[in-house]
Design a protein with these regions (language model features):
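Helix N-cap/beta->alpha junction signal
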Residues: 8, 52, 83, 137-138
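Short beta-strand/turn micro-motifs composed of small residues
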Residues: 8, 37, 49, 75, ...
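Flexible loop/turn connectors
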Residues: 48-51, 121-235
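Periplasmic-binding protein-like
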Residues: 1-11, 32, 72-74, 106, ...
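Hydrophobic alpha-helical segments within soluble ligand-binding/sensing domains
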Residues: 44-73, 88-92, 113-122, 141, ...
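Alpha-helical recognition/docking segments in bacterial nutrient-uptake
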Residues: 1-61, 125, 235
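An alpha-beta-alpha
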Residues: 57-99, 104, 204-222
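Alpha-helix capping/helix-boundary segments
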Residues: 11, 40, 79, 86, ...
């Protein structure tokens, strides 16, 4: 094995694990490692990633611009730095708008549709007043939409919802899901290119990270007039 493209879900607290990964390149038989999605450059691991803080901020700011003032969050596990960064972006957008960051507006899932559904049910049962929902991934957002439908909470007229990732499911959901686009095909392509450069010794000296630009994809969970086109590519 000459190289590994790693998409790790290990806790950010597992510092020893990340240091051991970084040490592979210094071993007798060098094994180069590229991290996908997570920025592990502080450990000396080349990372191809997006700015999750910015993504969380863009998502929240957009909901605010659409008239939402009580935005609930469906987060992934607390131990993941990707989710932490998205939550920090959410908080920053609220504070920029002069709004209070309220932890009672946050529920946690495990990235699955079921966990998003159950998290949304908890928010509803707790009597939390909300007019927007930021889900830290698309799969949980689908669960959010199901829970809202069961409780006759109309989307988007009463509550607007935004996800994160722009996976295929976001374009086929009903209503279709507004989300933050993470160009996963581009990310994988760059990771393979950079790993090849590392193996061949052509990677520029000092280069340790590559950030992929993200963007907002507007669909009908925030604007009923948006096209509900199914995306047949890049999924």
């Amino acid at each position: 094995v000459d190289g590994i493209i790693l998409n790790s879900v290990a806790s950010y607290l597992e510092k020893k694990y990340f240091r051991e990964l970084a040490s592979l390149t210094a071993s007798h038989k060098k094994v180069f490692v590229v991290s996908l999605e997570r920025n592990l450059s502080s450990y000396g691991i080349f990372s191809v990633h997006v700015n999750n803080f910015l993504g969380g901020k863009i998502a929240t700011k957009y909901l605010l611009e659409e008239g939402c003032s009580h935005i609930a969050v469906i987060s992934g596990p607390k131990i993941h730095d990707v989710v932490y960064d998205r939550l920090c972006g959410y908080r920053a957008a609220l504070e920029d708008a002069g709004l209070v960051y309220d932890t009672s507006m946050i529920e946690y899932g495990d990235y699955t549709t079921l966990s998003g559904y159950l998290a949304m049910k908890r928010i509803i049962m707790n009597g939390i007043q909300f007019d927007g929902v930021f889900s830290c991934n698309d799969q949980m957002a689908i669960g959010v939409l199901k829970a809202m439908k069961e409780n006759r909470i109309d989307c988007p007229s009463r509550v607007k919802v935004i996800g994160f990732d722009n996976t295929y499911v976001s374009s086929i959901a009903v209503p279709s899901l507004t989300t933050i686009n993470v160009p996963k095909v581009r990310m994988g392509t760059v990771a393979a290119q950079k790993l090849t450069e590392m193996i061949e010794g052509t990677l520029p000296s000092g280069e340790i990270t590559y950030e992929i630009p993200i963007g907002l994809v507007q669909r009908t969970t925030t604007d009923p007039d948006k096209e509900n086109g199914i995306e047949l590519e890049d999924w």
